[in-house]
Amino acid sequence: MMTVLSHKLNIVHRLCPFGFMQTLNRLHAVALMLCAIFMVTMFTSCIDEDEQPNTPTGNFEALWRIIDQHYCFFDYKQQQYGLDWQEVYVKYKERVSDRMTERQLFEVMTNMLSELRDGHVNLGASYDYGRYWAWKEDYTSDYSDSLERIYLRTDYKIASGMKYRVLDDNIGYVRYESFADAIGEGNLDEVLSYFLLCRGLIIDIRSNGGGELTNAERLASRFVDEKTLVGYMQHKTGTGHNDFSELKAQYLEPSSRLRWRKPVCVLVNRGVFSAANEFASMMHALPNVTLVGYRTGGGSGMPMSNSLPNGWMVRYSACPMYDSQKRQTEFGIEPDISLHLDDADTRRGVDTIIETARNVIKGK
C-alpha cells in the first residue's frame, strides 16, 4: 500500500492536473482551484485518521466515504428521487466480503455508484471503466448521422471541429460534434464571415458529450455584445452534505472579434452532456437564442478524482454549476421548443428538429 504522503501527492496530482486547469477560463479556474484546495485538505486529513486497508472491505469503505464527504448533489438528488446515501451504504455493505474476487468487488462498487445517477461518476480499474450512461441510453437519440449527411451533402466546409454549410433557405448550419475538438478564434472568424449574409444560424450540438469548457465559452462569446450573467458555481467548504460556499456568479465576456447578432437556434438532445450542457445553459440565457430538440443529458458538476487503496480511480461531481436563474441543470436543460425526430419525417430524409429550427428563424 502506498504511504500516506505519496497518497496525498497522488490526490493533489489527480485533483489539479496541469492540462485540465489550463483549459478553464479565469473565473472557472479560480473556482475549481478553490474547490480542489478544500477537497485536498479535507480528504488528506481524513486519510490521516481513517486510512483503509487494501482489502475488499477496506476499498468499499474508502469509496463510500470519499463520495459521502465530497460529492456535491446529495440534497438535490434526495429531492428528485429520494437518494439516501446511508441507505445505499447498508444496501451494498452486505454484498461485500474479503473473500470476494477483485472483479466481483468492482461490479458491486460500480452498482453502488450508479445509485447517484451521474454520468460524471466513474470507477476506473486497469481492466474496466465503471460508468452510468442511462442519462442518454434510456432515451431516444433524436439524432441521425444519415440525416446529417443529407443536410451537409458532400461539399460542406470544415473548420477544426466544426462542419458547416449554408442551407437552401439561406440559413447557416454548423455541426459541432464534440467540445473536445478545439476551435480557434480564426476558425470562428472564418465561419461567421461565411454566414455573413445568412438570415440566421443553426448550431447543432446533438449527441455532443462535452469536452473542453474553454471551447464552449469561446463559441458562446461570439453571441454576446456585453458582459452577460450566464450561471453560478459553488464549491465544498467541508465534509457535510450541505457544506457549500455562497453562489459565485459566472459571466460570459464578449469576444473582441466578429460577433453574431441575428437569430440563433441551438439543437439539443439527451446526448448533450457536461461542457455541451454548459454551452446550452449559457446560450439559453441569451435573448436571440432558441433551444430546439429534447431535454439535454445534464452533467453540471465539475468532476474531481481520488484513488482507492488498491489503486482504482474514482471520479465524481464535486462543484455544482447552475444556470443564470440559479436552477440546477444536473439532470438537463429543457429546450424552448421540445420535440423528437418524427419517424415519418426520418423515412423521407427529413430532420424534424432542423426543420423546426429553420421555421423559427424564418418566423413561421
Language model segments and positions:
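Short, surface-exposed connector motifs at secondary-structure boundaries
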Residues: C198-I202, R259-C265, A285-P287
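Bacterial Sec-dependent N-terminal signal peptides
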Residues: M1-P53
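Active-site-proximal beta-strand/loop segments in catalytic clefts of secreted hydrolases
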Residues: R175-F179, D204-N208, M233-K236, V266-G271, ...
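Flexible, low-complexity junctional segments that flank or bridge functional domains
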Residues: S45-H235, N242-K248, M313
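Low-complexity, Gly/Ser/Thr/Pro-rich intrinsically disordered linker/tail segments
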Residues: P335-K364
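Gly/Ser/Thr-rich loop/hinge elements
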Residues: E212-P263, G301-S305, A318, Y322, ...
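Cyclophilin-type peptidyl-prolyl cis-trans isomerase
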Residues: A276-Y294
